[in-house]
Amino acid sequence: MQRSFRAAAPAEAAAPPAAGASKGGVAYDLAIEAKWQAHWEAHRTFATRRREGKQKKYVLDMFPYPSGAGLHVGHPEGYTASDIMARYWRMRDYDVLHPMGWDSFGLPAEQHAMNTGTHPEVTTKENIANFKRQLRSLGFSYDWERELATTDVGYVKWTQWIFLKLFEQGLAFQDEKPVNWCAGLGTVLANEEIIDGLSERGGFPVERKPLRQWVLKITALADRLAAELDGLDWPEGTMTMQRSWIGRSEGAEIAFATEGGGEDVRVFTTRADTLMGATYVVVAPEHPLARRVGESDSAVAKYIAETASKSDLDRTSAKAKSGVPAGESVVHPLTGERLPVWVADYVIGSYGTGAVMAVPAHDERDFDFAAAHGLPVKRVVAEPDGAAEALEEAFTEHGVAVNSGPLVDGLATPEAKAKVVELLAEAGRGSAKVSYKLRDWVFSRQRYWGEPIPIYFPVTTDGDPRKGDAYSIDYSQPLPVPEEELPVALPELEDFQPGDDPQGCLARVLDWRFFQRDGKWWARETNTMPQWAGSCWYYLRFADPANTQQAWSAEAEKAWLPVDLYVGGAEHAVLHLLYARFWHKVLHSLGLVSTAEPFQKLVHQGMILGADGEKMSKSRGNVINPDDIVSAYGADAMRLYEMFMGPLEAVKPWQTEQIAGVVRFQNRVHALATRADGSAELGDETERLMHQTIKKVTADVDALSFNTAISQMMIFSNHLAGLKQLPAEPVEKLALLVSPLAPHLGEEAWQMLGHEQSLAYEPWPEYDEAKCVETDVVMAVQVNGKVRAEIKIAKDAAEAEARELAAASENVQKFLDGKEVKKFIYVPGRIINFVAK
């Protein structure tokens, strides 16, 4: 079926409201909203088109997780902003892709299943239906034919396919490592999902526990992830947060030889100039040296065990710096001095190398540790003026090198750093290096409701492991599921409880987990992917959602990518955006996408608070349901109010009573459409204000400054309402201008003005700059320096005309009566003054 992009509007405008038909102060029948929504759907008004030679705009919302609670009024704020831009750009003759879908895997549905016994798939579908109903009621111009959910079988297939691309590149690998185990959720959490030692979701305690995990090597692209932010039109705060999370540091890696001739202890430091002040070395409890020593030293073994239960935050924030001596020493790389090794939990095994050279004179943590354990402090950086007094606390600023040998002493900190790195390189014990705070992404989850990881392993067994016979899985030989066997689907399951087995509930589904091929037994991976997986690439699938042969075609990707406008909450400033950029850059390096970045422009809508100024939540009882607002005032009123509350990015409290202001504006626009007269002449003042309004609204919409655009349209509508004879042209322009923000009202007014076509693809109004210029000004008329009247006069009026108009004022005549005008002062546009005696 071919859609007509200029389908005829409904045959008749909605009849005037019957008594009682209006709601919330709306003076016209709100049935027009359902009417126009049905029209758009019936005529496929917003089905995506891609015309040769036309420019495109890809407008995308961060798609929602369909929770059971549905939307509250804060959610549609960003959706309204993106919809305004999609509608606006269609009227500017762009081809627009504006889709919507559902981030539908995740813990909440699984936890609900554990509590109620209802399968996550059932609750997810019910929640999606409710969300979709709410979004449709608000008149958003989504192309629903491209709707997708990350739980769709066809979508899961391609998510797994991308994982295998990462696996093929060595960017997805297994690692036995300490992870954040949350027994309450029965899964491993990423560092980003933990707040103050508790799970972000549910607030359950988190402990460190060694576990086999799938990890994505995001650090391999750390440099690009940081550097390539520069070309993006993103909020500066978001880019700063991403750079901080990546944490690029320039410094040096230094190798300390162990006394016994074993493997060097390597450390990274940004202050190589302080190397001569190192008095001991600290390794994390997870470090290989600590593990080796712990095999024969009970004190070290006990300390390692105690540390295992602490979170990274607990370890780094503790004021008392605990630790135990390892009983071994390392050799200073330049002096040959022996430095004792300590095991301490303020060093984290997954940060850097898991070891630090301790310079207590110039590092606060090292200073505290040295003070607690009686270790020496050696100052090697003096104040910039050369002062080097005994220290009562660590001196961490730049200064001048001292006590560092003749080749380094006297050098300022930057030069001292370079010199020490040079000396290390000559000795073969170090080199300049860039390090990152960013750690590789722990990707696996021990849960049910997620994409199965498409990997299997060889199994050794003398029986049938599906029947409970003994078996052994060789996890050292991961094999990718062949592409033709994708997707690996989840098995049906009734018991979703994770239990005490860190492998998760899928490990209990023996008929699914184990299978035979070519006479051999194999075991599927029982870990699933995190909720982040589906949201890492959904923007690509929207470009080609019906493709069963590819995740997307090269033609579709080139036609639509990158996303031109991405709208979503600032809470995703780091995680989702960083992960999606990582996947995209891998795909780019494989030649599977044509752009280096997925999202060109990013906008964060500000949070809408409850009327009490607090974040909306059920516990506070301050949640406002958009269904109630739409029922009482209509979708257009809600859209206009949310955009009129203040700047899009600002945090704003919801005040239902203030909707009345935009309702008055709606009523005025509707009333103007009823009385517009095609035969009435367009006066100069009205024409000028019309062009000024088109100019201002156009600039404001381009800048996503919707509150000021609405304000200007209110000014214009007030002017039009005051005209005795109302021409049709300015009302038509107003209907077009208001339509992206209040689309039902815009369509209805357009039809009332005699147009048969929907205005969805009508050209956006143009303004004439020359007609925006004010030709008249209001000037004060003075008599002997005191203002006695005001007159309206052409800005460039001649002196004779100005004198005649000013003198004609009754009040001016009063103060000139009986006096002789000695002088007339006139500066066009500025001063009119009679000097009289």
State where each predicted segment sits.
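Basic, alpha-helical terminal appendages of large translation-related enzymes
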Residues: 1-56, 284-287, 297, 356, ...
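N-terminal catalytic cores of NTP/NDP-binding nucleotidyl/phosphoryl-transfer enzymes
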Residues: 48-118, 147-162, 269-270, 274, ...
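Conserved phosphate/anionic-ligand binding catalytic regions in large, soluble enzymes, centered on
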Residues: 265-286, 441, 447-449, 453, ...
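NTP-handling and nucleic-acid-processing catalytic cores
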Residues: 28, 32-37, 85, 158-377, ...
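Helix-rich, typically C-terminal accessory recognition domains appended to large enzymatic cores
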Residues: 103, 168-182, 432-463, 628-798, ...
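Conserved oxyanion/phosphate-binding beta-strand-loop segments in alpha/beta enzyme cores
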Residues: 12, 16-60, 90-99, 121-132, ...
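Residue patterns forming the tRNA-binding/recognition surfaces of aminoacyl-tRNA synthetases
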Residues: 11-19, 25-28, 34-35, 39-43, ...
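Alpha-helical recognition segments enriched in aromatics with Gly/Pro capping
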Residues: 328-334, 338-351, 380, 504-650
